[in-house]
Amino acid sequence: METGGRARTGTPQPAAPGVWRARPAGGGGGGASSWLLDGNSWLLCYGFLYLALYAQVSQSKPCERTGSCFSGRCVNSTCLCDPGWVGDQCQHCQGRFKLTEPSGYLTDGPINYKYKTKCTWLIEGYPNAVLRLRFNHFATECSWDHMYVYDGDSIYAPLIAVLSGLIVPEIRGNETVPEVVTTSGYALLHFFSDAAYNLTGFNIFYSINSCPNNCSGHGKCTTSVSVPSQVYCECDKYWKGEACDIPYCKANCGSPDHGYCDLTGEKLCVCNDSWQGPDCSLNVPSTESYWILPNVKPFSPSVGRASHKAVLHGKFMWVIGGYTFNYSSFQMVLNYNLESSIWNVGTPSRGPLQRYGHSLALYQENIFMYGGRIETNDGNVTDELWVFNIHSQSWSTKTPTVLGHGQQYAVEGHSAHIMELDSRDVVMIIIFGYSAIYGYTSSIQEYHISSNTWLVPETKGAIVQGGYGHTSVYDEITKSIYVHGGYKALPGNKYGLVDDLYKYEVNTKTWTILKESGFARYLHSAVLINGAMLIFGGNTHNDTSLSNGAKCFSADFLAYDIACDEWKILPKPNLHRDVNRFGHSAVVINGSMYIFGGFSSVLLNDILVYKPPNCKAFRDEELCKNAGPGIKCVWNKNHCESWESGNTNNILRAKCPPKTAASDDRCYRYADCASCTANTNGCQWCDDKKCISANSNCSMSVKNYTKCHVRNEQICNKLTSCKSCSLNLNCQWDQRQQECQALPAHLCGEGWSHIGDACLRVNSSRENYDNAKLYCYNLSGNLASLTTSKEVEFVLDEIQKYTQQKVSPWVGLRKINISYWGWEDMSPFTNTTLQWLPGEPNDSGFCAYLERAAVAGLKANPCTSMANGLVCEKPVVSPNQNARPCKKPCSLRTSCSNCTSNGMECMWCSSTKRCVDSNAYIISFPYGQCLEWQTATCSPQNCSGLRTCGQCLEQPGCGWCNDPSNTGRGHCIEGSSRGPMKLIGMHHSEMVLDTNLCPKEKNYEWSFIQCPACQCNGHSTCINNNVCEQCKNLTTGKQCQDCMPGYYGDPTNGGQCTACTCSGHANICHLHTGKCFCTTKGIKGDQCQLCDSENRYVGNPLRGTCYYSLLIDYQFTFSLLQEDDRHHTAINFIANPEQSNKNLDISINASNNFNLNITWSVGSTAGTISGEETSIVSKNNIKEYRDSFSYEKFNFRSNPNITFYVYVSNFSWPIKIQIAFSQHNTIMDLVQFFVTFFSCFLSLLLVAAVVWKIKQTCWASRRREQLLRERQQMASRPFASVDVALEVGAEQTEFLRGPLEGAPKPIAIEPCAGNRAAVLTVFLCLPRGSSGAPPPGQSGLAIASALIDISQQKASDSKDKTSGVRNRKHLSTRQGTCV
């Protein structure tokens, strides 16, 4: 997209608000050649100018320093904008402008245009002058922000262009920019933008009586001799057309060998028989393709249309219906002679209303037209089926019979084909479309011509998503319909364009997903030529919140190879002008594609012809097989033939490039098994419910859709409206998420299967018919009525699971009379889903069972006979959510308030007075039919409902009639710049001027561009033309537009103000509704007539006031901080003493100053009748107050109904108030105090003693247990006695018997586990003094232990050393540790 601003070339000078004037340097009636730049210069100029202007405007500095008031003047550092301009730098248009100069510019401003803006320009020339508009730059949000161009001075004049999106030079630097022409001498341009996103806007040059496009630089602008005020182009040689923009006889047509140039006739090349092309440069046949624009006769603008349909019959292209700006001269039926290039108008006597978005299909001499939107009938989508007979030129209508439980959908934006099935039945197949009731339909509809019946068949294969504005072609070879693109509702409540390609096999009713094109679009065309589907044009805009440059109108040219499942991009038409469009039609004759009409800001009436290469031109086998793109050829017996004409004998098929399996990322987009496996991308369905590449590893995969189990979740997700969701009993509509969800499987119960709209159960028990029926009845069901193919397939699959026994179950089919069989649900047996076996039904049987033979079928049997099995059926138990009725569809809501009552679900178009689904706004108004839409607030639907001139001129179809008082009073009327208008027919185009509605002779003044200077709403005269002198009639405001405080009403346009009725509890009320702003907290109601009893407020505001009832001994806090409390200046309280022998204390404080009054009363009517209360306290401007009321003084005992009233007033918002009433003794009772104190102290002491005693007991118990464990452990240790000989000097102890021999021995050895180490324990004699005795206080002996290695000792030694150790117990078993 182009991001630059609008360039003003030359030396522009401001001419009027909203226009910039530039005088051309050359003559010729204001031509523009002197300042035209090439495309690259435009882009560069736009970029620099945009950056410079944006750098100024975006800075929030005083305008005196920056000088950045774009359309205004700087006064006191503030921009004062010229009329029609707004913004802090006056940079956005917002209003109406009148341009009277012979040429000039108009623009929306220097930067991106404003959100939610409406701007209108009236260019006024003189009657019947030719006015030309050239769009040097145009960039708006496609399909949402539009510029409307009318050939006249109001929106009731003929509409000639609706511009939207990006319109800039695209292919060549010298490419001509679009030009729009009006012939009335006036042009009204109205621009509307919504609140989504904005772009750089537009720069439009206009000129009056100038040559078209300045003769495109290929001619001279000349003044007409007969009419001096008119000019025309004298074209240079080899250029023709009104603007000299059509080249002819290039290279002199290759004369004389190839052809010659016809200079006297139509000025084109006349080729010799062996040459073709616009310049006779291609052979016949040719290996190259080319485009041409034939000379059409007559070339009437009324032929132009979009969203029409065309079919080919012989040499005639029949065009029926379509959208046009003006239906008054619209021809419903046209035919175009493809040989002579002549249009003819069909003149049937009677027929259908004009429509667009319908379908056409040809069968023999009849053209079948179905559905579409009837623009002249409130925009309703119809389900009418009309037949046009070509021979008799007459219409007839058909009313088909809908079979079964099907539905006939009224749709638009669908497609249709008629073919003969293998069953010899001729069927018209209607594909997808949008229904105003059921949303985007994904169903196939069949119309059987011979039986005049309608059917919605069940399809197999992939689960596809239907939409609006797709294209489809039927291929006789594959017996399939190929469907591409469209505008669809997508998951997650999203919607947009798609590039999907589906194949529908008409005989097997199977869907397959093919390779997508990579270029999303809708309202394009598609034809089938030589095995290739050619896609041309369409709307490719798919932006949401940010533009990425996608164009509304495309000239993209794509080719799909059916045999190889490959897409190719073909070159765009290389013609002398743009051919971008959408909403066109295309047919094929003699291998050439003819494109007609469409929309590209204007309604197109031209014919484009595409001549593809001819297979016969290829002489080589390899060249033949590799021909393309856009053509498919086969080699047959040494010559090349087209894909369709070749027979099956001796044919060498074309080569296809090898296909590789898709990546996992590509396969992840398929969320169900059927779509994953019924496509050509090479995917497989893995056991963990995920679609992955066929080359990826998977433990258990499904590669054929016939093995898939259809999940209701995937079917329900494709249903885009509550109505369509409710038709499928397996689905339910979630109102909060606004999506269709599958019903849970447990709705049937354990042992049952949820199939379609029923629960089925197969049992193998052997019963007769009556007992089988009783069995099902006990399960709250009945014998099954198998009326759908899904139910039959399920039962057959269940029967096959019984491998150990033969199951032939009873079904709910019995003989009603001698020739009639019926199901148990009273539906007739149609012999379609199930059939009788050969020889059946026999005369002896009155009940039927299902026999599983080589071919499954029914057999008749006596009802008393036994059968092996039965099939039960019961209805689905629907949850509460599904029981909720759907809301009224948007298309059935007839008022703005009803349409916008449910948030963003619906959108109201005020100009067409239609309500549409939010996800279908684009397709409901594909050609900008809606001038303005609303989703919340509703404006008056007619001009008469607008009360002020400012409101009136905001609507492009209204004008203001100012009354003679010149005080701002008047009335708003539909009108034009010349005066008011009135409606004489049903459509707004049937408006005529009626100046009597605002008679000038009676001093009424008509205002269309700007309001009269004095706008005092009839309540004051003006001084200095625009200043209200003194507002009267209880009004105030700069324009006396508001009521004075204390009054309400709508004083605009002479309205009255009424005093507020607030029961004395408010001084002001809402200015318009009169709802009182009550000043006392707790009083509510429109007239302050109620107390807020739900929040403890009591009283009667009609006779007094309201009080908050306080509880004694509680503190209450009132935070008046919310916006709803802004008007509160008072709050009242009441309190009743609870004890008659205690004083009543009051405490009140607040965050702001307040006035306080306290009264008391014993009467029951106090608070409502003055004089009943006695004043106690009256304080002003305080923040805190405390007091005590004596029970003796006020005699609480004798006055049990005594009530204290507290009035807090005159405070400011916001405020926080705390108040409390309490009753307690004033003199402390010492006896009671000490009794209470000692009671508490002794209780606490007792508790402490008990806790201490419990603690001591627990401690003693734990100590005893610990000692016991220690004694047990000590008692379990090993022990022994040992003799010790002590020597003191040389003496021997007396009691030793015998001498000591050998070395000293240990007193103990404790071997470790493994007997490789031990702990040795010995006695040691400590050093002694000279006396041989140890020092005083010390022992002479000590015990020492050491770890020793005993692995090298002899066994005998070890035995000796350990012989003294006895009673050894609990030796450790852990290696390397001692005991």
Curated annotation (Swiss-Prot):
Protein origin, superkingdom: Eukaryota
Domain PSI stretches: 614-657, 666-709, 715-760, 889-939, 942-1012
GO molecular function terms attached to this record: carbohydrate binding; Notch binding
Gene3D superfamilies: Kelch-type beta propeller, Laminin, Mannose-Binding Protein A, subunit A, Spermadhesin, CUB domain
Residue span(s) of domain Laminin EGF-like: 1014-1059, 1060-1108
Residue stretches making up the C-type lectin domain: 755-873
Presence of the UniProt keyword Transit peptide in the record: no
Topology, Cytoplasmic side: 1252-1379
Membrane topology type: Single-pass type I membrane protein
Domain CUB: 93-209
GO CC term, one of those recorded: membrane
EGF-like domain span: 53-91, 207-245
GO biological process: G protein-coupled receptor signaling pathway
Keyword Transit peptide tagged: no
Kelch repeat positions: 316-365, 367-415, 427-475, 480-531, 533-591, 592-638
Protein task: May play a role in melanocortin signaling pathways that regulate energy homeostasis.
Protein name per the record: Attractin-like protein 1
Gene that encodes the chain: ATRNL1
